[in-house]
Amino acid sequence: MSERIVLDEAAMKRTLMRMAHEILEYNRGTKDLVLLGVKTRGEFLAKSIQSKIQQIENTTVPTGTIDITQFRDDLELPTPKISEKSFVIDVDITDKVVIIIDDVLYTGRTVRASLDAILLHSRPQKIGLAALVDRGHRELPIRADFVGKNIPTARDEAVSVYVKETDGRNAVIIE
């Protein structure tokens, strides 16, 4: 199967800058704004958007990471007792406007798990969703507030997001 580059490094940079502007417009600035990246690639995208917001607004927005592994219902994991230690949200989100940032929005199950983890942990003022790629095929009634690129795909296609921090390059590829 051949691969198709959907976003190269320059296009990804422009897309993340646009998403940063959209998030700022949505929130009317940076007041009470917290970016929460879903491990693994979402956390690096959140840091990139944080950097772009800092360029635009000349202020730093708190950015954290959420590991939702124990909240997934689509992985073959034993059903452990969920405790505060079974997921990580490393920034205070109480009464904040939280933007969950993920690399690919597909079935919606990662977002559902993120919401479960967040609401068990805290009570944000508002929660929004940003996805670099929305590929469709939802299994849950979930939609992103901020989308970098809508990419209609077949279910058997793979959408891969590469980030410099883990993959050595920034790109979005369909395989």
UniProtKB/Swiss-Prot annotation:
Motif PRPP-binding per record, residues: 98-110
Domain of life: Bacteria
The protein's enzyme class: transferase
Record has Glycosyltransferase as a keyword: yes
Gene Ontology biological process: DNA-templated transcription termination
SUPFAM superfamilies: PRTase-like
UniProt function note: Regulates transcriptional attenuation of the pyrimidine nucleotide (pyr) operon by binding in a uridine-dependent manner to specific sites on pyr mRNA. This disrupts an antiterminator hairpin in the RNA and favors formation of a downstream transcription terminator, leading to a reduced expression of downstream genes. Also displays a weak uracil phosphoribosyltransferase activity which is not physiologically significant.
NCBIfam families per UniProt: PRK05205.1-2, PRK05205.1-4, PRK05205.1-5
Name of this protein: Bifunctional protein PyrR
Naturally occurring in which organism (per UniProt): Staphylococcus carnosus (strain TM300)
